[in-house]
Amino acid sequence: MKRRRLIAALAVSALALPALAEWQPSKPVRIVVPFAPGGQPDLVARTLAEPLARALGQPVLVENRPGAGGNVAAEAVAKGAPDGHTLLVATNGPFAVSPALSRSLPYDVERDFAFVTMVGSSPSLVAVHPSLGAATLSEVVAIAKARPGELNYASVGKGSVSQLSMALLSAETGIETVHVPYSGGVQAVAALLAGDVQLLSLVPTALIPHVAAGRIRIVAQTGATRSPLVPDVPTVAESGFPGFAAPVWMALVVPAKTPPEAVKRLHAELARIIRAPEMKERLWDRQWIDPIGSTPEEAARVVREETAKWARIGRTLGIALE
C-alpha cells in the first residue's frame, strides 16, 4: 500500500514539474533592432515590448543598433549571452539577403540563432520624387534608360531588402542606377523628400503619410499581389516585369544556445500577443504589418526558403554583396 501511494505521489509530482520549471526572466529583457529609431522594425519592437513586459513580469527594453544593413546587430546578438534575455528583430536583409549574397559574414543564421516566431510580413512600395516626372514604373524605366547612371536610390543600408529589391528591379528592367545607403528608414525617406535621391523601395509605414501631401509618388508595389493598402497601385509584375516579388518580413530570434524552456516561454507569450485581435489593429491598421505569430519551425522554414530564393537571384543576375 505504501509503495502504491509513493508511486502515485511521484506521478503527481512529475505532472507538476512543467509548471514549476516554466522559464522566468531574472532581469530586464532586451529587443535589439538592427536599424535606427523610427523605422518599421523599431515600431514593431516597441509595439510588442509593453505587452511582453506584462506577460513576463520584467521590463522589456528596445535597443537600436544600426549598421551594415542590420549585420552589426545580428553579430552582436549572435555573440551575446544565450540566457533568454536578448531577442533580435530579424529581417530579410541580415537573415536572408546577406547570407545568400555576401562572401563572408561574422555570423551564421542556422548555427548562431534560434527562431522564436515570425512576427509578420508587409508589402514594399516603390516611391519616386515628384521632380522625376514619372507617374508609373514604366515611365521611371524610360527616364532611367535615357539617363543611365544618373538616378540614385536610397536604402536602409547595404545588404538590406530595400537595397536588393531595387538592385533586382534595376537588373530586370535593364536600367543603371546608383545605390546610396542610409542608416535607417527615417533617414532614407528624408533623402527622398529632399530630392537627394530619386527612388526608394520601403515599407508603407514610412511612405504613405507623404503621398497625400504630394511630396512623393508611389509607382509600384513589390509584393506578388496588390496590397489592400494601395489597391490602385500595380505590382511590379503587373507593370510589365513578371515574376518579380520582394515582400518584407520580420521574425524574432535569440542566440542559438538559449535554453529550450526560455525559447518555449518566449514563443508562447509572443505568439499569443501577436495573434490577439487588439494587436492585429495595432500592427495592420496602424503599421501595415500582417501579423503571423508562427511556430519557431515555421519561421525557420520561411527564412531558409527566402535565403535560397535570393541565392538563385544572385546567381542569375550576378548580384553580390561585398
Positions of predicted regions on the chain:
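N-terminal export leaders
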Residues: 3-8
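An extracytoplasmic/periplasmic, membrane-proximal ligand-sensing/linker region
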Residues: 26-28, 172, 260-322
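N-terminal (or domain-start) structured segment
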Residues: 21-111, 150, 158, 174-199, ...
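Hinge/capping helix and adjacent helix->loop/strand transition within the periplasmic-binding protein
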Residues: 79-85, 100-187, 236, 249-282
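A ligand-binding cleft/hinge motif common to bilobed small-molecule-binding domains
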Residues: 94-104, 168-172, 199-233
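C-terminal lobe and pocket-closing loops
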Residues: 121, 207-276, 286, 305-308
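Short coil/turn segments
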Residues: 34-38, 92-93, 121, 129-134, ...
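N-terminal signal peptide c-region/cleavage motif recognized by signal peptidases
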Residues: 16-18
